[in-house]
Amino acid sequence: MNVVLKFVRFYGYRGLRIVKGSMQYVWDDSGRKYLDCHAGHGAAFLGHSNPAIVEAVVRQARELVAASSSFSTPSLEEALTEFSRIAPPWAEEIVFLNTGTEAVEAALKAAWLATGKRGIVALKNSFHGRTLASLSVTWNPRYRRGVPVLDTRFLSPSTDPGEVEKLVPEDTAAIIVEPIQGEGGLTKIYAELAKALREAADRVGALLIFDEIQTGFGRTGRVWAHESLGVEPDIMTAGKSIAGGLPASAVLSREGVLATLASGRHGSTHAANPLSMAAVAAASRFLREEGVPDKARAAGALLEGLLRDRIEGLRLVRGVRGEGLMLGVELRLDPGPVLRCLQESERVLALRSGATVVRLLPPYSISREDAEMVVYGLERCICGGSGC
């Protein structure tokens, strides 16, 4: 007798079967419509089934799906051209991969090879992935438990910039930082700390890595969130939305850094595959031609303003955090019941960040009506019958 294998879920099941999506909305198998502020952990920032991405992927699927990066393909060439138009000006080299954690692994490996050192510095409350090296620079002890992770020195995001120099050892190969901590309660790194980390990296000959997997590609209202810090890294990771929701990631570096991974020092079967590259090219073009970062900044300002007006003063709310369309509401209680209420009663999908923050990662296309739906739904779900 054939038995369907049991699917092991990495994340807690939300009790919802999603069958269709269109831009900022998804539908379940009963036809109910939801505003999606979860967006596949932020991957659907350009919208579910964005026609520009769908058209490019369907066209490519009819021509060529699989090819090793030992060969050149038109879709890879197009992806390089389009992504280069939105890349930060300091970047000179790029590799395409499949997932965010893969990008972090490659970034750290390149740093080790380029510097000849082994030490790593990261920030407390960071999240960079769940494979071995990326897990080693992820703070959450629950994720790390039982796994022989690499030694990492963790600094507080509130570290005094004047203290950074003596906290970064001489044997450091890489300092890795998220401009805004996706799982760390949406804590923003401040410019003074970023500058101190840049100076410390230069002093010891380490490479500074900015992890822009969640913050990048327009979500914060800039193409890359680190643009607001006045600091340039040596390496940057990108992922989630760079292929319009399909699996793709990238690592960018200064000249000579990623080159250490060439000629068999690194590899990935599906890296730079034609289908994903067609999606990266289409997504990059759409981001630029449609002015997506500017639209995200405007939509984020609207949503943040409504949250501050209606939500921030509630008795059970500590504050509103984030930037652009990467926003969070810090609560004085477990966000789990609030997330369930949003889904079941308000038809808004969201997720948590850290222990007490409701995280909102909607597509760039949300409207004022959508923003009001989120805010009034949050107000009802936070207050319940308490009259707060």
UniProtKB/Swiss-Prot annotation:
Reactions it catalyzes? [amino-group carrier protein]-C-terminal-gamma-(L-lysyl)-L-glutamate + 2-oxoglutarate = [amino-group carrier protein]-C-terminal-N-(1-carboxy-5-oxopentan-1-yl)-L-glutamine + L-glutamate; [amino-group carrier protein]-C-terminal-gamma-(L-ornithyl)-L-glutamate + 2-oxoglutarate = [amino-group carrier protein]-C-terminal-gamma-(L-glutamyl-5-semialdehyde)-L-glutamate + L-glutamate
The GO cellular component terms are: cytoplasm
Query: Which GO MF term does the entry hold, naming one?
Result: transaminase activity
Q: Which cofactor does it need?
A: pyridoxal 5'-phosphate
- List localization entries: Cytoplasm
Task: Kindly state which keywords UniProt assigns to this record, in alphabetical order.
Answer: Amino-acid biosynthesis, Aminotransferase, Arginine biosynthesis, Cytoplasm, Lysine biosynthesis, Pyridoxal phosphate, Transferase
One Gene Ontology BP term is: lysine biosynthetic process via aminoadipic acid
Is Cytoplasm tagged as a keyword? yes
Q: What class of enzyme is it?
A: transferase
Amino-acid positions noted as binding substrate in the UniProt annotation, renumbered to this chain: R130, S268
Chief location? cytoplasm
Which pathway does the record list?
Amino-acid biosynthesis; L-lysine biosynthesis via AAA pathway; L-lysine from L-alpha-aminoadipate (Thermus route): step 4/5; Amino-acid biosynthesis; L-arginine biosynthesis
Give residues annotated as binding pyridoxal 5'-phosphate. Answer: G100, T101, F127, D211, E212, I213, Q214, T269
The Swiss-Prot or TrEMBL record describes its family as follows: Belongs to the class-III pyridoxal-phosphate-dependent aminotransferase family. LysJ subfamily.
State the protein's name.
Putative [LysW]-aminoadipate semialdehyde/glutamate semialdehyde transaminase
Write down the species.
Aeropyrum pernix (strain ATCC 700893 / DSM 11879 / JCM 9820 / NBRC 100138 / K1)
